[in-house]
Design a protein with these regions (language model features):
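Basic, glycine/proline-rich low-complexity segments that contact nucleic acids
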Residues: 1-86, 95, 108-266
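Glycine-rich active-site/cofactor-binding loop and its immediate structural neighborhood
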Residues: 87-95, 99-105
Length: 266
């Protein structure tokens, strides 16, 4: 994928680097899978902030993506599109057996006209969705479901993938992009391949306004706050903190694990 670099005619374009999305379809193909989206901006049903640094953002609509496996399905890629709700691109697929259209996450190197399949007795091939019992060890997989009845929850961001490390009779172990190991059921499923838009992390927004378009608000340092707002706050003039780095709620942020992992597969 190529990049778009702009001439520095003003400060906001001096360091701007964006991805070239000219190959994507401009108009959504499946209008029935698109609905209006009400932005809650990191608030819960009481209006309280549960996720900080969220708010604003430009209006956009939600695309319904198929994150479930079809028992038997054969489809053809009809278009590649941009989705404002995620970093990866999406692909519209025409299901030959059910004679309808669905959206899926686009994979790297997946092209318009490619045939994809899902279900039992499916070949191990780019874009095909298989159960873990049919996937060979060492495969790069994405859109991972922990069990048959669940939707895909892991490796859905741009450029992410997991690796199938080990298989037993009922369970298998996968390594996520974060390096964490996860145990999932053999009845779960995954898609062969790496999620599209793998160069997304290289783009440079170059101005605060682009972050605000993406629903991102500024992140204020703890030492710049008052003592009531953060453990690092307060003091006359500028202070260096004078204590170990902690979260606004007092939990240590460095040199100490705050979670335990029992994902050991013997």
């Amino acid at each position: 994928m190529t990049f778009k670099k702009y001439k520095p005619v003003n400060a906001s374009q001096r360091h701007l680097i964006l991805l070239n999305r000219s190959f994507l379809k401009k108009v959504p193909l499946i209008k029935s899978k698109i609905v209006g989206l009400l932005n809650s901006s990191g608030r819960n049903n009481q209006g309280k902030i549960t996720v900080r640094h969220k708010g604003g953002g430009i209006k956009h609509k939600y695309r319904f993506i198929n994150f479930k496996i079809n028992i038997i399905s054969i489809g053809i890629i009809t278009s590649l599109e941009y989705d404002p709700n995620r970093t990866a691109f999406i692909a519209s697929v025409y299901d030959i057996l059910k004679k309808n259209y669905i959206y899926i996450l686009a994979l790297s190197n997946l092209k318009i006209g490619d045939i994809i399949q899902s279900g039992n007795n499916t070949l191990v091939k780019l874009g095909h969705t298989l159960y873990f019992k049919d996937i060979p060890v060492g495969s790069f997989i994405s859109c991972i479901s922990e069990k048959h009845s669940a939707i895909a929850k892991f490796s859905r961001s741009a450029g992410t993938y997991s690796t199938l490390i080990k298989k037993t009779r009922n369970y298998c172990q996968i390594k996520l992009s974060s390096g964490k190991y996860k145990i999932v059921s053999n009845s779960g499923f995954a898609t062969i391949g790496i999620v599209s838009n793998e160069n997304n992390f290289l783009k440079i927004l170059a101005k605060a306004g682009r972050s605000r378009w993406l629903n991102k608000r500024p992140s204020v340092r703890g030492v710049a706050m008052n003592p009531i707002d953060h453990p690092h706050g307060g003091g006359e003039g500028k202070t260096s903190g004078g204590k170990s780095s902690v979260t606004p709620w007092g939990k240590p942020t460095k040199n100490k694990k705050t979670s335990t992992s029992n994902n050991k597969l013997n």
